[in-house]
């Protein structure tokens, strides 16, 4: 095709010729990849618009219905609802056909959002009309927010799953998206004993639940998920990271799932909210400017400029101001008490000498004084940098004090918003959070202050971003821990010394008080011998201590001190230096370890806190899991439809009757030949890998990825994600360790993959494993004995499917369907489709289908 002219009459002629060409010609001219890219772009644009509409609908549900009725929004909402219905009429047929053929994550999300947008937009438009008639806000919010007490919760549904054999149907209740994820993993594990029809019915229920949750838009409601339950991606991540000696299950217990719903950092300031107040676009500019000027004059500052209204000082701010004023003033009472304790201790110690029998508390007091004196110099240097304020409040009181300023800002912001609305619009809007504020406050009042505090944190506020709440809570956590005695001693050693001094003085006082009581009539004399502080017994103890237990007379201690002053001073200096070094090293090591543990603990709790308070949006993990599992059963369904369809021209041979004498002879011929030859034990590892490939679920196909992993990895994730019991995992691992014919040859004539008479999920699953093991071992022996080529075993749910159907190759397919478990195909065309020369043999006997493969050239 010649290039398009740039301009002139030739360009016009070229455009006319282009428009005259039929669409099929243009499809032939335009490359397919360009058409696919254009379609993808269009679908992404539609998906983005649907997601935006769903988010706006969620906002309008919480808006004052008077605004929706009086202003032009009512017509716009109905217009959007009609546009969504138009899109549904144009796309629903193709999307439904695509969902029944093969899915991608993008197509499935678009299909979910389109269905949900139709129902939500129509419901909102109807409720607005109802409110325009009855003017009942309670009714409007109850209907839009699904708060009716007698109504059914759309987030609770029952999903049933039928299994092979006499096993009763399994029923699961879906209330959280975690429940849906667990059910998908369970179906993935039990795919060997689930028919296509049963899986399709169960997946329809899961699809409806996902449409009601994930299909509702971006933001995930807190009642739809539980971040403490790990998902399959959590297990995958922990499987490739260092375990630090802990088991995978212990580490999963401490994990915070961020895959089903992903947290998003939202830093919105009150200025941003005020700057983007709703409905301002419809307000006249002069009216808006005049209202802003009036609000500035009444508040004494800028509206939305970060300043508070004049005269409003939050409770928490007043507490901080009072605390700072107290710190800037005279020394606190605690410091004066410390000085008094030290003076009293000095007077008590001075009343005892080597000739005086001192009680036990005095010795402890002397030792403490020694340690205090040796560490005094180091303590004086670190007093200013390590001192911390002592918090006397309880944890909740301290937390409430720290958060009061933040809550006060939210209340002030709410008052400013109401003032702005009254000034601009003439009324204050009764949005959802304001309409139910009194009810929420009454519920909070029943639980007490602690529950009200937690409720405020979880509910949040337009004036406070989640990040600000998180930082405030973390700061409060550090402040609380630093106020504990352990960290106070690490941060301020002198505080620990003072506490020990007080304890020793108290103990000494308790021991000396009984002596003063026994004095009786000598109380007045004893009072005269008290020290200046009135400490009883000090002077009396001095008089009674003139002679000790060996009868030594008091000596002149001053002369002794003068004689040995130099030696003692050198010894004390050396001991003090050594002691200072040891204390410093010990304190540094203990402080580093303690603060490291505290930081690690706070870091772990911070992850929990961030997940709880941040805005969470639905991730792509759950839709991707649904798509992978659904595509597996869709591939099995497409395969069965292709080989059993009457429209195909291939040769079909269906052998299912048990009265077939010829088939029985074929069965006996192959079975007898296999029983005369034993399996090579060296081939067991390879056969085990083939077994793992066939039994692993369609959701985890790690062995067929671009960078394939061993097949046992796929099976590992299949069984670990459902919490399979250890003895069942050991039994599954040992399935391929035996090679005796009597143990692995389990099927009789035309009874392959027959579960009649078997009940229980574990027993049915065990029988399916036994049948597949028999197929793997029999095919390997068949190849080695008859030398007729490879008897390739394949899975029907692993075939590639395109617009024309499944792409096949010659071999034996395991369908995992109880009615048609084995299908042998040969003679596939070059395009990997069934043609007139293709032969399809449907069997229920393993050895008869091997006989058919052996004689395929004769047929």
Curated annotation (Swiss-Prot):
Taxonomic superkingdom: Viruses
Subcellular location: Host nucleus
Biological processes annotated in GO: viral DNA genome packaging
Compositionally skewed regions (Basic and acidic residues) per UniProt: 512-525
Positions contributing to ATP binding: 782-789
Keyword vocabulary terms for this entry: ATP-binding, Host nucleus, Late protein, Metal-binding, Nucleotide-binding, Viral genome packaging, Viral release from host cell, Zinc, Zinc-finger
Molecular function GO labels: ATP binding; zinc ion binding
General function of this protein: Component of the molecular motor that translocates viral genomic DNA in empty capsid during DNA packaging. Forms a tripartite terminase complex together with TRM2 and TRM3 in the host cytoplasm. Once the complex reaches the host nucleus, it interacts with the capsid portal vertex. This portal forms a ring in which genomic DNA is translocated into the capsid. TRM1 carries an endonuclease activity that plays an important role for the cleavage of concatemeric viral DNA into unit length genomes.
Oligomeric form and interacting partners: Associates with TRM2 and TRM3 to form the tripartite terminase complex. Interacts with portal protein.
Protein's recorded name: Tripartite terminase subunit 1
Native species: Psittacid herpesvirus 1 (isolate Amazon parrot/-/97-0001/1997) (PsHV-1)
